[in-house]
UniProtKB/Swiss-Prot annotation:
EC numbers for this chain: 3.1.21.2
Protein source organism: Enterococcus faecalis (strain ATCC 700802 / V583)
GO terms for biological process, alphabetical: base-excision repair
Full protein name: Probable endonuclease 4
A single GO molecular function term of this UniProt record: DNA-(apurinic or apyrimidinic site) endonuclease activity
Amino acid sequence: MLLGSHVSMSGKKMLLGSAEEAASYGSTTFMIYTGAPQNTRRKPIEEMNIEAGQAFMKEHNLSNIVVHAPYIINLGNTIKTENFGFAVDFLRQEIERAQALGATQITLHPGAHVGAGPEAGIKQIVKGLNEVLWKEQIPQIALETMAGKGTEIGRTFDELAAIIDGVTLNDKLSVTLDTCHINDAGYNVKDDFDGVLVEFDKIIGLDRLKVIHVNDSKNPMGSHKDRHANIGFGTIGFEALNGVVHHEKLTALPKILETPYVGEDKKNKKAPYGFEIAMLKNQTFDPELLEKIQGQN
């Protein structure tokens, strides 16, 4: 089973440090940002410690890693077009970085229309992706399903399908499905995930689904909020998310946890991932999980 979490990539260790963190959680896969998600400053590829990282991954059965593009990249903005060229250039470089790291999927928030309307935003995203993608690239851009907060595009499968249909080299496009986001967008993950997959297959095609973000939600279905909760402690619940992780149609896909760190004060928050991964492997909900996470050294 390909199950892991978001891990950091920083310092001198870079990819090796990410792989070590993932292994410490009992992961078989992981997701990284190539630098801080809130900015676009990036180290050169030769400083990412790729050889040592990949050797460690091989030894510890870690594979199918995912890169997450920074969320400040907005291809959908038709209001402030001066940032468009930069976003296109950055994404092209991100594909090169992902390829060097050995990742075949780059999760990307499609963008926001910032008031111009979804149609204008979709058109602009299509234009951007047509400039970004090239025939020889190996990694796919995995457009993420969004919660529909503000003017986000990708709140429905139809919006993602419209982007995919508009892009010339759309064999380079795939989809990241986030359980919290689609719940908050109005899809019934809790009681009818099979129905959600049927709808996804009809509109986009299950063959495009390449990454799953496994998150519970702090908000009710259809709230358009996007606030992640720890597994089993939100409105989706453990049973449904365990069903997603162990779903027979999703066996080959990396499942990535992006659940919140646990703790009352910011300085002492603890990573939940080792505990949540173990719980999902055991397929039994632990109501005392949050206390156990907080109690770790």
